[in-house]
Amino acid sequence: MKVNKFTKEKSEFEERVVEIARVSRVVKGGRRIRFRILVVIGDQKGRVGYGIAKATEIATGVKKAVSLAKKHLITVPIIADTIPYQVTQEFGSARILLKPAPIGTSIVAGGVVRIIAELVGIKNLVSKVLGTANKINNVKAVFAALSSFDPERVEQAKKQMEKLKNPKSEVQNPKQTKSKKDQIKSNKKVSNLEN
């Protein structure tokens, strides 16, 4: 496809506008009205970022917020379509609880947590938003929670998941081992022969 100034190239990130707020500043001539835009972007492969920008027009504000979000990306460890372990985070009066969920649960979360989880690529998650309903503080709390994973605990969670997926059989050769019933029978035969 030929690229010119009218065709839009496809970005690697999906972007979602979380909030548009009309804000004003009082100046000498009256009120100066602008828009504050909160945007979250993600590639659904573990990378996600957010940006907050102000502009007199919504379109320019969204562009500013997207460019800020691209500068502040974080990478989230995803194990079996969920997070490695439960995490709780506070930011201001916002408190966020994120719990890993088994396959098939889907995203049990509301508001900004659902949007961020979808953009990260998490498919199974249980979440609870406690405290404020302020979207900016909730986004910051979720990002703080997602970037707070300890690499050592993540590795432990990966190893546990691999053990669950591929349980190694303790029995290498089934002919060598006997069931409990067979062992009891053979013990009885030996004791009968001795008598």
Please identify what each model-predicted range represents.
Residues 36-73, 79-81, 99:
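Conserved mixed alpha/beta catalytic, RNA-binding, or beta-rich assembly cores of soluble enzyme
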Residues 75-99, 157-165:
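Glycine/charge-rich, flexible interdomain linkers and switch-proximal surface loops
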Residues 1-13, 152-195:
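Intrinsically disordered, compositionally biased charged tails
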